[in-house]
Regions:
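Charge-rich, low-complexity N-terminal segments
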Residues: 1-49
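Charged, low-complexity interaction tracts
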Residues: 32-186
């Protein structure tokens, strides 16, 4: 195996390890996102499909990982009911790359939240009567809140990705240079 590939693998392992560490610190470790973090190192191919020199690293995670990492801007607005009626929603997703569109939360978001609520064993209650509410109602209430307030960016993946480039740039460059020297001396 080439020194360059070894250096790329070292970088990729660092990014995954640090990303998982960040998720654990944010009390989101052990879940689907944590388990889905992975990488794959591939050798470059030319137009004809033949292998060429150099390698690429691809990182994989659950689709919603990008939203957790980079944040989502909420639509804002004012609260219509409850004790905080008339107060504006605080937008947690400031600086987020993504944003919710006007309207209501989509069904896939509500369905995902419903699954999460059941997995966590969360039981919602009606504020006035104290009665339990259905999981569907609770998931809609949470989805509506997230839709208005957004998702705060965590940069759990972006920070290690950038830090890894800074940390391993010399190792990767030296390994690539050594591989070139080895090829020229053959």
């Amino acid at each position: 195996m080439s020194e360059f590939k070894d250096a790329i693998i070292k970088y990729a392992r660092y990014v995954i390890q640090q990303s998982r560490s960040n998720l654990t610190k944010a009390k989101k470790g052990g879940g689907n996102l944590y388990k889905s973090l992975d990488y794959k190192v591939k050798q470059n191919r030319g137009n004809s499909g033949r292998f060429e020199s150099g390698y690429n690293v691809e990182f994989f995670m659950e689709d919603y990982g990008a939203y957790q990492d980079l944040g989502v801007k909420g639509i804002g607005g004012q609260r219509k009911t409850g004790a905080n009626k008339g107060k504006a929603y605080e937008n947690k997703g400031q600086g987020g790359q993504f944003q919710f569109r006007k309207g209501v939360p989509n069904r896939s978001m509500i369905k995902s939240l419903n699954t999460w609520i059941k997995r966590k064993g969360i039981k919602g209650r009606n504020q006035k009567t104290g009665r339990f509410i259905t999981d569907q109602s609770l998931s809609f209430a949470i989805a509506k809140s997230v839709f208005h307030t957004g998702i705060k960016r965590s940069l759990f993946f972006s920070k290690p990705f950038e830090a890894g480039i800074t940390k391993y740039d010399n190792d990767i460059a030296n390994a690539y240079g050594n591989d070139i020297i080895i090829e020229l001396t053959r």
